Amino acid sequence: MVLPNFKENLEKYAKLLVANGINVQPGHTVALSIDVEQAELAHLLVKEAYALGAAEVIVQWSDDIINRERFLHADMDRIEEVPAYKKAEMEYLLAKKASRLGVRSSDPGALNGVAPERLSAHAKATGVAFKPMQVATQSNKVSWTVAAAAGKEWAKKVFPDASSDEEAVDLLWDQIFKTCRVYEEDPVRAWKEHADRLDAKARLLNEAQFSALHYQAPGTDLTLGLPKNHVWESAGAINAQGEGFLPNMATEEVFTAPDFRRADGYVSSTKPLSYNGNIIEGIKVTFKDGEIVDITADQGDEVMKNLVFNNNGARALGECALVPDPSPISQSGITFFNTLFDENASNHLAIGAAYATSVEGGADMTEEELKEAGLNRSDVHVDFMIGSNQMDIDGIRQDGNRVPIFRNGDWVI
């Protein structure tokens, strides 16, 4: 690497993810999912976790090339099946209340050209099989953090004009370190100050308890109802054991769940979405009485239709997140083709499941109680970006009065 002080900064990054991200405590079990290309970072993460007293660190390796070959050539019945040993591993991790650290670095187009029905069948099977883990994660029963590492093919997509593959990787690592505050003199303090700023916005919105939100922008005119006693959350979270953690590194969002029964109007995406190894652009969605009645995409249309119409609960929304256009990630002008970063450059919505913590007492509710409270239940959760510097958002009170929240893509509340 030619990036100055790369090894030193990679070590700082690993410490940040383990100590502040999933917040490893003595006796914790840690599940790390990471690509084989990122072995150097994986070694650092494992060492840091054990240094903080982890009882066990389980590494779940992935490989884009192997995954692609499997999707192209494996028998269809194997694509549609989740092996028993994978379910057993999930049950083991749940029993141990394992903290989950997912490091994303995949090529956004790794599965381009794979038949959409094969991808859809696999996504549906894994969604059903790993539902208990999804529920535990989305109700913060365990600590979980999603982070990123600079994969070569991903870096080439983000920086196509780089003079070499090595330069592209360096440029992407530089952006990851910047957005995760690794370059700060005291990254831990910098994260606390950032989280405090986001928490202040969440408190204002929680006090307001708006009945609905109204989004307006070119290609968008959408009204989303909000559940009674909804909760706006921001950077930090608390697991069922009372331990703090950071779900996303980086993050710029304040988010809650809409009432899945109350969505009317239409919305257009403003950034590409990388989903299931495909890049999807120009998404347009129409809602009536909470349900998606039409969805199209200029690129990846069949993939999106399969997502929405072939997965349980995917015809409704599970998240609405507010991100100011002047956020550092947005102002970088870079499209990352990675939801972790692109969602933190833009207001976004999520198709599918809501986080249980988006309503008061939700972490202790049954699936049926969550649904009665207005939180969508689904086997999927897929964010897509809708924000821009032309977006206005109003909060609508119970009496119909409106309060400006965003004007021209930025906070005014």
What is each model feature region?
Residues 294-363:
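Dual-mode signal for accessory low-complexity, basic/Gly-rich regions
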Residues 130-132, 200, 208-211, 251-254, ...:
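Glycine-rich, charged/polar anion/phosphate-binding loops
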Residues 368-413:
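Extended hydrophobic packing segments that form well-structured cores
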Residues 225, 295-296, 406:
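Short linear motifs in exposed loops
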Residues 1-264, 395, 401-403, 411-413:
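Active-site bordering "gate/hinge" segments
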Residues 262-264, 280-282, 289-292, 315-319, ...:
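Active-site lining segments that contact anionic ligands and/or coordinate catalytic metals
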Residues 256-312:
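Long, well-ordered mid-to-C-terminal structural blocks that present hydrophobic/aromatic surfaces
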Residues 15, 206-208, 276-279, 313, ...:
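Short solvent-exposed loop/turn micro-motifs enriched in small/polar/acidic residues
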